[in-house]
C-alpha cells in the first residue's frame, strides 16, 4: 500500500533503521520511514 504523502513524523530515506516502520509514499523517492508504534 503506497501512501500519498509521508507523515510529518516520518522521513524519506533509501534505508530505514531497523526500529522504524518501512512504508512507501508517493512523495518519497525510496522509503517513508515511520517511528515504531505511530498512529
From Swiss-Prot:
Activity relative to temperature: Denaturation temperature (Td) is 98.3 degrees Celsius.
Disulphide-bonded residues: 6-33, 12-28, 16-32
Residues modified to Pyrrolidone carboxylic acid: 1
Record keyword Signal present: no
Keyword set, alphabetical order: Disulfide bond, Pyrrolidone carboxylic acid, Secreted
Superkingdom of the source species: Eukaryota
GO CC terms in record: extracellular region
RNA-binding as UniProt keyword: no
Protein localization: Secreted
Broad class of the protein's primary localization: secreted
One Pfam match: Meleagrin
Family from the record: Belongs to the transferrin family.
Annotated protein name in UniProt: Small basic protein 2
Organism: Anas platyrhynchos
Lineage: Eukaryota, Metazoa, Chordata, Craniata, Vertebrata
